[in-house]
Amino acid sequence: MRIILLGAPGAGKGTQAQYISEAFGIPQISTGDMLRAAVKAATPLGLAAKKIMDEGGLVPDDLIISLVKERIAQPDCANGCLFDGFPRTLAQAEALRAGGIRIDHIIEMNVPDEEIIKRMSGRRVHLASGRTYHVTFNPPAVPDKDDLTGEPLVQRNDDCEETVRKRLKAYHELTEPLVGYYRNLSMNGSADAPKYSRIAGIGTVEQIKDEIIATLNG
């Protein structure tokens, strides 16, 4: 089964992707990992991508699609794969389909923006240990202090509300059109159209996991 997991940053895709990968015995595939592996292995595609990146350019979609084809032909993808952070744009989704790469199921994790802002802007981190807290969901015993050392907790720049809002804006402009694209594709009934399922990404991690796994098994 080949799966694409869609959702805004902070929707919980990373956590659920691990569960899906384990449940179905399929690898997570990210374009970043693919590019690094191809460059390291010095494959023709990897060398072409490296030349573009070394010149400060963006790797074009046709090269990314070729890398995807190369990757999914490997033995660990025999039972499928889970695409992680790809496709990001409508052009990539269309190129994926034009390239004859069949996708079986699209899962959209739907979480309102204000919930994502609350989740992300409430995170606090103890830098030395990496211990993570949340001011609402997992607060430290003493506000803004690490439970074990008493040292100060910090809010990472990525978690500041202004940054989160910018990332959500970019998601809505670039990636959200994929939701409509795949939903319409699913509804038009063409033979190669993937199934499309929207999951509410609110609830416990276990509840969301169970719903996603049941949906994929359905």
Curated annotation (Swiss-Prot):
InterPro entries: Adenyl_kin_sub, Adenylat/UMP-CMP_kin, Adenylat_kinase_CS, Adenylate_kinase_lid-dom, P-loop_NTPase
Record keywords, A-Z: ATP-binding, Cytoplasm, Kinase, Nucleotide biosynthesis, Nucleotide-binding, Transferase
List of residues binding AMP: T31, R36, G57, L58, V59, G85, F86, P87, R88, Q92, R156, R167
Keyword Transcription: no
Pathway noted in the entry: Purine metabolism; AMP biosynthesis via salvage pathway; AMP from ADP: step 1/1
GO biological process: AMP salvage
Subcellular compartments: Cytoplasm
Residue ranges, annotated region (NMP): 30-59
GO molecular function annotations of the record: adenylate kinase activity; ATP binding
Recorded catalytic activity of this chain's protein: AMP + ATP = 2 ADP
LID: region residues: 122-159
PROSITE patterns named in the record: ADENYLATE_KINASE
The EC number(s) this enzyme carries: 2.7.4.3
A GO CC annotation given for this chain: cytoplasm
Binding site for ATP: G10, A11, G12, K13, G14, T15, R123, T132, Y133, G203
Subunit-structure text: Monomer.
Stated family: Belongs to the adenylate kinase family.
HAMAP family: Adenylate_kinase_Adk
Summary of the function given for this chain in its UniProt record: Catalyzes the reversible transfer of the terminal phosphate group between ATP and AMP. Plays an important role in cellular energy homeostasis and in adenine nucleotide metabolism.
Domain characteristics, as noted in the entry: Consists of three domains, a large central CORE domain and two small peripheral domains, NMPbind and LID, which undergo movements during catalysis. The LID domain closes over the site of phosphoryl transfer upon ATP binding. Assembling and dissambling the active center during each catalytic cycle provides an effective means to prevent ATP hydrolysis.
Name the UniProt record assigns to this protein: Adenylate kinase
Organism this protein belongs to: Chlorobaculum tepidum (strain ATCC 49652 / DSM 12025 / NBRC 103806 / TLS) (Chlorobium tepidum)
